[in-house]
Curated annotation (Swiss-Prot):
GO CC list: membrane
Tissue: Expressed at highest level in rhizomes and much less in leaves. Not expressed in stems.
Keyword Membrane: yes
Species per Swiss-Prot/TrEMBL record: Zingiber zerumbet
Topology versus the membrane: Single-pass type II membrane protein
Species lineage: Eukaryota, Viridiplantae, Streptophyta, Embryophyta, Tracheophyta
Keyword field contains S-adenosyl-L-methionine: no
Top class in the EC scheme: oxidoreductase
Name recorded for this polypeptide: Alpha-humulene 10-hydroxylase
Known cofactor(s): heme
Gene3D superfamilies registered for this protein in UniProt: Cytochrome P450
Catalytic activity: alpha-humulene + reduced [NADPH--hemoprotein reductase] + O2 = 10-hydroxy-alpha-humulene + oxidized [NADPH--hemoprotein reductase] + H2O + H(+)
Subcellular location: Membrane
Further remarks about this protein from its record: The recommended numbering of humulene gives 10-hydroxy-alpha-humulene as the product rather than 8-hydroxy-alpha-humulene as used by the literature.
Amino acid sequence: MEAISLFSPFFFITLFLGFFITLLIKRSSRSSVHKQQVLLASLPPSPPRLPLIGNIHQLVGGNPHRILLQLARTHGPLICLRLGQVDQVVASSVEAVEEIIKRHDLKFADRPRDLTFSRIFFYDGNAVVMTPYGGEWKQMRKIYAMELLNSRRVKSFAAIREDVARKLTGEIAHKAFAQTPVINLSEMVMSMINAIVIRVAFGDKCKQQAYFLHLVKEAMSYVSSFSVADMYPSLKFLDTLTGLKSKLEGVHGKLDKVFDEIIAQRQAALAAEQAEEDLIIDVLLKLKDEGNQEFPITYTSVKAIVMEIFLAGTETSSSVIDWVMSELIKNPKAMEKVQKEMREAMQGKTKLEESDIPKFSYLNLVIKETLRLHPPGPLLFPRECRETCEVMGYRVPAGARLLINAFALSRDEKYWGSDAESFKPERFEGISVDFKGSNFEFMPFGAGRRICPGMTFGISSVEVALAHLLFHFDWQLPQGMKIEDLDMMEVSGMSATRRSPLLVLAKLIIPLP
């Protein structure tokens, strides 16, 4: 299905209609204009703005995180864009982010409450990622930490991850000996991550699996859709006019119906004591039935959390794997080094298990370096300022949205050196910099109260997939294609995925068990 984008002619028609309506309803006096100019002067610096649209035009024609990085280099590490009717503050330096997280994390702990996609697909704030800060969010966050994705439960999913990874290597081995051996690795990795998530969420006997994944893929196609109402909150009807709202609600309605069927199946299995595994949906249903939460867990809550895990967790994990393989193919010395380490550490064993992964220290460095160059969310999920505060000497008004440009932080030469744009896993040797939120120059999963609750779960899937791919196979580009021909540009959506799929040839080196 076609999504409305910044490049759609219909978008511009709708946008200019919005401008016309805004002009009709706008009331201002000379005194209010003067007051607005005084307030504007105390905001962070801004690129030149156009009437009514503000800085929207400057974000057209490229990936927003790259455009914002260039704007930061011109106008400073903390800038304020006017996107329609919304003030959007963008932090692009370690110093700015450190001040925000250390001094004002609570003031920036909120999420925008009226974003069209999250309002519809996350059931109007019934999960964690896009839920506004407050008691209900704290409860949901605790459920994630204590019940759903704690280290013990993530480890309990090891057998599922290993089984899915072995099936993936089997499919790749089969394709490697086919008449047309070129493999779309991006597609296969995405299918693998989907399979892991659906099994830990619903089990391997989910009758609706294929249809559900089809709907999730359709939902993901709308993530980067441009919502006029997100930038003009007073003109929400424009999303109805463009057809975006009806498309989102149509896909969501189908997903909601599938959720109802899956919940009914799991409830029947639990009642008959036929549930073979303690799945994510089982845990949530038990919490709902116990009814001892301050904020009651409802069927809507259950569906919102599972939806969140799928939409926020599948594409991000698969994109990390995709980028690791891309960087290793483009850097054959690093590829040789990581494979040599793994194959020597296995000492002749052919069956790789998760318990072997801690032996692969260079793989850990490779993953870190890939997360630095290709953070899955280059622009962290937007926050909203709960009360007016001062950051780097500038006033950030209550209600302003905040974007942290993780892409810019991880390319800051002040912290990463003059070779910050280069793939160099060795830069992480002997240093304590990690991605768990304490190092502001490297925060692909966020930091503070809003750090990603599924980080451990996602990284575990990434590690087991890469370990199997690199241990069993040698990789190269299709015949006639040179390393310098490999497209390394990204497109923005729920995460920054490859602009073009990774097409490769695989050669089986270590026999499959």
